[in-house]
């Protein structure tokens, strides 16, 4: 009797010991799984924040481009590319300007005014040529305005080089107003469609990247929940 009881006790002890070992293994697996889930959750949160930050930055870039580049592009009326032939290029007069010489320091100087008249091939009109749209805003009498500096001789030398280039290449492309309201043409568009495309390309890529990151994280979370439900059903 004593021997039988001792054997039973020993067997029960071994069974309890095995169960304790299995329980420890299971607890360890659950702990590892929780750690893995926590790490994945933190990584997913960071990925979502990165995607949202990319989208916010792209929206801010769209806003800045919209009030600067896109606005100037839409306001420009010189949209038709044409051919111009030089009629006359000459320095007519000088104008006063001011340049910065340091913090809260401005000095007066002068720049020569170059006037270039061209013949617009499509209409045969004699029109004044401007370098860019900004040239008209600075001084409507000058086709080309050099940067204001303290050395007038350098400005004069630069304008002479530009004038000689016009006389050398008398046939060139220019941009005119297709409506004919502006009696002038420009040589170079500051904001062409090509510049506009390249300026909007990178914010669009950033927006697409942010949306893709958020979508992939959400898809991963959905598939994870779906797999968990399937495993529960199979059990």
UniProtKB/Swiss-Prot annotation:
It comes from the Eukaryota. The keyword Ion transport applies. GO terms for biological process: action potential; detection of calcium ion; neuronal action potential; potassium ion transport; regulation of vasoconstriction. One of its GO terms (molecular function) is ion channel inhibitor activity. Glycans are attached at residues 88, 96, 119. N-glycosylated. Disulfide bonds: none annotated. The chain crosses the membrane at residues 47-67, 195-215. GO terms for cellular component: plasma membrane; voltage-gated potassium channel complex. Residues 1-46, 216-235 are cytoplasmic. It is a multi-pass membrane protein. Keywords: Glycoprotein, Ion channel, Ion transport, Membrane, Transmembrane, Transmembrane helix, Transport. Residues 1-45 are annotated as: Ball and chain. Gene3D superfamilies: KCNMB2, ball/chain domain. It is found in: Membrane. It holds the Pfam family CaKB. Its main location: membrane. The ball and chain domain mediates the inactivation of KCNMA1. It occludes the conduction pathway of KCNMA1 channels, and comprises the pore-blocking ball domain (residues 1-17) and the chain domain (residues 20-45) linking it to the transmembrane segment. The ball domain is made up of a flexible N-terminus anchored at a well ordered loop-helix motif. The chain domain consists of a 4-turn helix with an unfolded linker at its C-terminus. Belongs to the KCNMB (TC 8.A.14.1) family. KCNMB2 subfamily. Interacts with KCNMA1 tetramer. There are probably 4 molecules of KCMNB2 per KCNMA1 tetramer. Regulatory subunit of the calcium activated potassium KCNMA1 (maxiK) channel. Modulates the calcium sensitivity and gating kinetics of KCNMA1, thereby contributing to KCNMA1 channel diversity. Acts as a negative regulator that confers rapid and complete inactivation of KCNMA1 channel complex. May participate in KCNMA1 inactivation in chromaffin cells of the adrenal gland or in hippocampal CA1 neurons. PANTHER family: CALCIUM-ACTIVATED POTASSIUM CHANNEL SUBUNIT BETA, CALCIUM-ACTIVATED POTASSIUM CHANNEL SUBUNIT BETA-2. This is Calcium-activated potassium channel subunit beta-2. The gene is KCNMB2.
């Amino acid at each position: 009797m004593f021997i039988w009881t001792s054997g039973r006790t020993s067997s029960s002890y071994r069974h309890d010991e095995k169960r304790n070992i299995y329980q420890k293994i299971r607890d360890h697996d659950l702990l590892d799984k929780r750690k893995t889930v926590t790490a994945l959750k933190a990584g997913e949160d960071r990925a979502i924040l990165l995607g949202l930050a990319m989208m916010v930055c792209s929206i801010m870039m769209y806003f800045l481009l919209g009030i600067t580049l896109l606005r100037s592009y839409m306001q420009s009326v010189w949209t038709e590319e044409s051919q111009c032939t030089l009629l006359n290029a000459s320095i007519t007069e000088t104008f006063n300007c001011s340049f910065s010489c340091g913090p809260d320091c401005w000095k007066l100087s002068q720049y020569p005014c170059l006037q270039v008249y061209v013949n617009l091939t499509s209409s045969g009109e004699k029109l004044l040529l401007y370098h860019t749209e900004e040239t008209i805003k600075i001084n409507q009498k000058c086709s080309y305005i050099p940067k204001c500096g303290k050395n007038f001789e350098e400005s004069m030398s630069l304008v002479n080089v530009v004038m000689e280039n016009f006389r050398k290449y008398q046939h060139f492309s220019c941009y005119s107003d297709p409506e004919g309201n502006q009696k002038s043409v420009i040589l170079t568009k500051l904001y062409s469609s090509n510049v506009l495309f390249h300026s909007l390309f990178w914010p669009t890529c950033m927006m697409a990247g942010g949306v893709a990151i958020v979508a992939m994280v959400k898809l991963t979370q959905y598939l994870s929940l779906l797999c968990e439900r399937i495993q529960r059903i199979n059990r």
